[in-house]
Amino acid sequence: MAPVSLPPGFRFHPTDEELIIYYLKRKINGRQIELEIIPEVDLYKCEPWDLPEKSFLPSKDLEWYFFSPRDRKYPNGSRTNRATKAGYWKATGKDRKVNSQRRAVGMKKTLVYYRGRAPHGSRTDWVMHEYRLDERECETDTGLQDAYALCRVFKKTAPGPKIIEHYGVVHHHVEQPQWMTSSIDRSPTLDVSCDGRGDDFESSSFSFPTETPMDSMHGGFGMQMSAPHEDGKWMQFLSEDAFNATNPFLTNPVSANFSCLPSKVDVALECARLQHRLTLPPLEVEDFPQDVSLDTKIGILRSNPNEVDILQEFLSVATASQELINGSTSSYPEMWLGASTSSASYVNELSSLVEMGGVGTSNHHESARLQVEIADMEVFKDEKKRVENLRGVKLVNNDLGEIVVEGDESNPTEDIIAQYPIKVTADNSGEAGHRMTDPTDVGGIDTAPIFSQSQPDDFAAGFDDVNPNASFDLYEKVDVNHRLFVSRVAAAKTFFHRIEPSKKVSFHSNPAATAVSKATEKFHFPVTTKVSGRVSIFSKFKALIRDKFLMMRPSHSYQRLGSKETTVNELLQIVSLLLAPKQINGCPTEQELVKKKAKEVMKPGWGREGSNKLWLPLSKGKGISSMFLSGKWTFLTSALAISTPAECDH
């Protein structure tokens, strides 16, 4: 399509909502656009400085609009490929929602062009706003897979178009409010980026108007108490559509989510719509933001500039006046001009306006500061015993009026201070007791004191009706308690133990070696050795017999070895007895020394039959004939007579 030239004075400055709802939605859904002024260009195959010549609307406004197909960076991914030959577009900030009639219709992304390759690219002044349609707004079955994105490209360092030059108006600082209010177009750089970084106005030469011209443009809005003849000036900028249209910012400021700041035209329309509502009767009170607050009774106080400031009146309607305690509360509700309206509605309106705090005073008429006395009270009625929470304001300045607001009587017992006097009574048993009495029993509710914040704390207020002459009946009573002390001794604990039979351990050794060792020990026993240590003849004889008999025995049979050993032992005993000397002249013989040693090592098993140990007579000083009493060797008793005594060496 060839470039379209617009007549002088016509410019293409659509809003974000119009770009998405009309142009982008019709493009994606295949519907016809009445005037095709946005071309279809693949922005990511072109450099930003080459885009102006591809636009259908060449103008002095350095911004251009294009439909760009969304090129996928990966075949199965959702990321868009935004790289060009000389650089790349980098997203800044986060996406913002674009709302239309309180619902999100699309998203807006801000991108900045960088020369080179990431992450070492250099930032430029080219900025692009990419608009995407929400999937719920797409009517085709394919969705947004093959959809387009509407892009607005501009260079933010370039000076924005001056509206004065386009219209041929001479620029004067004094006349700035006139052209601002009469102009309905918007500068291309006025669309503020809300990504938190200020990319659109970092180095822009566009200057925002100050607050004073904006107040003049709004016609004194901002709750200035101007004269009624200024209301007609608001109507010259409005059309019939301005009153019928709804704006999410006005109806619900909390839920409204703006993608950017409103333009001057939007602000003017909103101000005019609010001013129009001021002239209408208050049918409904809505929640308004702080900068567009309403008061349904501004017309009451606007006629007299010397009246009380409405903000101070709203803040003062919180508690009751001190004069209401005296009973003069009947004439105050009549002071409201709108007395037919319920008091609850006024309370709701006033409380909402006080919380918003957006009401200001006129620059021409400033009221003096007022001192307000605030107090709380509670009036108790005698007939129905109900309580009304009456709140009023008393102004120190006598020239000012007083405002009284009646509270809600739906909960009459909310702030009642319950008082129950205590009486001392005597019950049937004669013991003094206390019981709680109802306030009506002591003269009614009028006798109870009225508490307020200014009164000191009186802790005896609830005990006014206590009878000081309390009667007490005393009696004596003797109680005898018979008790039995029972003690319990713990039973002894029995620990059971188990006795196991002894285990028999058998040791098996070589019988031949055992017999030889025993025989050797017996033959080495010193029998005839003298005390002096000299070897006697008997020792030599014993050694000879041991060598002759023991070395010649066979060792292949255990039974034969035992019998021969017994025979040798008996023979040695006989020879020892024959050669044993008697005790002469009190000298201990060698035989006595042997018997002493035998006593030391003797055990109870010695001397029994079958024992292989040497047995010697234990009696001292007796003859050797006592050994033969058992009759074992009777045939040798005659040999004892020829035994000769041995010499005793000292």
Swiss-Prot record:
Gene3D superfamilies: NAC domain (2.170.150.80)
Organism of derivation: Oryza sativa subsp. japonica
Segments forming domain NAC: 6-156
InterPro entries attached to this UniProt entry: NAC-dom, NAC_dom_sf
Additional comment: Under exposure to jasmonate (JA), NAC54 is degraded via the 26S proteasome-dependent pathway. Plants overexpressing NAC54 show early leaf yellowing under dark- and abscisic acid-induced senescence conditions.
Keywords: Abscisic acid signaling pathway, DNA-binding, Jasmonic acid signaling pathway, Nucleus, Transcription, Transcription regulation
Domain-related comment: The NAC domain includes a DNA binding domain and a dimerization domain.
Transmembrane segments: none
Domain of life: Eukaryota
One Gene Ontology term of the molecular function aspect: DNA binding
Keyword Transcription regulation: yes
Localisation per UniProt entry: Nucleus
PROSITE patterns: NAC
Role: Transcription factor that functions as a regulator of the jasmonate (JA) signaling pathway. May regulate the expression of genes encoding JA biosynthetic enzymes, such as lipoxygenase 7 (CM-LOX1), allene oxide synthase 2 (AOS2) and OPDA reductase 7 (OPR7). Involved in abscisic acid-induced leaf senescence. Activates the abscisic acid (ABA) signaling-associated gene ABI5 and the senescence-associated gene NYC1 by directly binding to the mitochondrial dysfunction motif (MDM) present in their promoters. Possesses transcriptional activator activity in yeast.
DNA-binding region as annotated in the record: 105-162
Main location: nucleus
The protein's name: NAC domain-containing protein 54
Phenotype seen when the gene is deleted: No visible phenotype under normal growth conditions, but mutant plants show a loss of susceptibility to rice dwarf virus (RDV). Plants carrying rim1 mutations show a phenotype of root growth inhibition, semi-dwarf phenotype with short roots, and sometimes twisted leaf tips. Mutant plants maintain green leaves at the age of senescence.
Tissue distribution of the protein: Expressed in leaves, roots and flowers.
CC annotations in GO: nucleus
UniProt keyword DNA-binding, yes or no: yes
One GO BP annotation of this record: abscisic acid-activated signaling pathway
